[in-house]
């Protein structure tokens, strides 16, 4: 039963109604390695989970040509927009994976592949009965430990205070991650501002930035 469900999810994950040279294809039998992500091997690799319209990664890719950027996004309209932007800027260091990362993550990539992973504004699922649907949980932290090397960085942002506090508690309990300077930041300069983030700021919402370094595998 579990195996049948997993096969069905893989089938859904690989069912993209259009093609592009910027797509990566996930496989249930072979993990993606740095050698088969791009036409060349980059110095470092950056993974954005839920890349939306792609503006954050594209802005960073323009500034960091020696880093390969992998974007995981499941919504087709956002993927199409991102592809147009990649083509507009003639970027050779951005690829897209149309896979729901809440289904498959460490199953897709080889260990220690990414030096940085970004998760911006995931659904906070505010109702208590929906908390189990939240992306960041103890299992997710184990996935981060697999994908990041020691000293690898994880960037997280939310505009929902209770979610931020829960994430902080999870990291405290993990012991594998350490804040770079402080547990919670009100500003972040390393990552460009997304459309969603700008909108929330204009609405007067407080943004919670939680960045961590993997210190123990």
UniProtKB/Swiss-Prot annotation:
Q: Does the keyword DNA damage apply?
A: no
**Residues reported to bind substrate:** 127, 159
Q: Which residues form the active site?
A: 123
* The enzyme's E.C. designation: 2.1.1.33
Q: Name one Pfam family in it.
A: Methyltransf_4
Q: Which GO terms of type biological process are on file?
A: RNA (guanine-N7)-methylation; tRNA methylation
UniProt-annotated binding residues for S-adenosyl-L-methionine: 48, 73, 100, 123
Name the chain's protein: tRNA (guanine-N(7)-)-methyltransferase
The scientific name of the source species is Leptospira interrogans serogroup Icterohaemorrhagiae serovar Lai (strain 56601)
Its lineage reads: Bacteria, Pseudomonadati, Spirochaetota, Spirochaetia, Leptospirales
Give me the gene this protein comes from: trmB
């Amino acid at each position: 039963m579990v195996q049948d469900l997993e096969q069905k999810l893989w089938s859904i994950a690989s069912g993209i109604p259009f093609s592009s040279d910027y797509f990566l294809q996930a496989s249930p039998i072979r993990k993606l390695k740095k050698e088969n992500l791009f036409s060349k091997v980059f110095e470092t690799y950056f993974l954005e989970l839920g890349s939306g319209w792609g503006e954050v990664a594209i802005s960073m890719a323009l500034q960091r040509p020696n880093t390969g950027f992998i974007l995981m996004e499941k919504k087709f309209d956002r993927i199409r927009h991102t592809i147009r932007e990649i083509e507009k800027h003639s970027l050779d260091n951005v690829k897209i994976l149309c896979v729901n990362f809440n289904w498959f993550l460490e199953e897709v990539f080889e260990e220690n592949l990414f030096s940085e992973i970004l998760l911006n504004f995931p659904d906070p699922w505010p109702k208590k009965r929906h908390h189990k649907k939240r992306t960041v949980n103890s299992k997710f932290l184990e996935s981060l430990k697999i994908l990041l090397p020691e000293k690898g960085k994880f960037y997280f942002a939310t505009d929902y205070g209770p979610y931020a506090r829960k994430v902080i508690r999870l990291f405290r309990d993990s012991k594998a991650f350490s804040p770079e300077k402080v547990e919670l930041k009100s500003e972040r300069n390393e990552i460009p501002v997304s459309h969603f983030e700008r909108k929330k700021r204009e609405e007067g919402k407080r943004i919670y930035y939680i960045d961590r370094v993997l210190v123990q595998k």
